[in-house]
Amino acid sequence: NLWQFGQMMSDVMRKNVVFKYLSYGCYCGWGGIGQPKDATDRCCFVHDCCYGKVTGCDPKMDIYTYTYSKENGDVVCGGDDPCKKQICECDRVAAICFRDNKDTYDSKYWFYGAKNCQEDSEPC
């Protein structure tokens, strides 16, 4: 669920970063339109696409299980429910994407606003 995603992001990035990504670019936050503005925003675009492929459960609400290793930074999705595991994998890939692209984060895209995202969206 979205709370767990925020926790996973904080685990992987080793600090509480949820507020920085809550409304960033054209895709970080609720929904998304237009073209991703940078690699950080593209992480959110890919995450939105991943959630869009989940069927049989609710990515924003359903609770999954995962473990995080502080030693090596690995996230491992667990549990027996394949749908919830798929949600966790979407979140895991996005959290790692944020970490790997943290240098592309540009504060000018924080609270960027949909009015600046009028280009045609690319397909997932």
UniProtKB/Swiss-Prot annotation:
EC id: 3.1.1.4
Cofactor section:
Ca(2+)
Q: What tissues has this protein been observed in?
A: Expressed by the venom gland.
Q: Which cysteines are joined by disulfide bonds?
A: 26-117, 28-44, 43-97, 49-124, 50-90, 57-83, 77-88
A Pfam family name for this chain?
Phospholip_A2_1
Biological processes, Gene Ontology terms: arachidonate secretion; lipid catabolic process; negative regulation of T cell proliferation; phospholipid metabolic process
Q: Which InterPro entries match?
A: PLipase_A2, PLipase_A2_Asp_AS, PLipase_A2_dom, PLipase_A2_dom_sf, PLipase_A2_His_AS
Q: Name one GO molecular function term.
A: calcium-dependent phospholipase A2 activity
Manner of cofactor binding, per the entry note:
Binds 1 Ca(2+) ion.
Give a GO cellular-component term: extracellular region
The protein's role, per its UniProt record: PLA2 catalyzes the calcium-dependent hydrolysis of the 2-acyl groups in 3-sn-phosphoglycerides.
Q: Which PANTHER family match?
A: PHOSPHOLIPASE A2 FAMILY MEMBER, PHOSPHOLIPASE A2, MEMBRANE ASSOCIATED
Name of this chain's protein? Acidic phospholipase A2 2
| Source organism of the structure | Bothrops asper
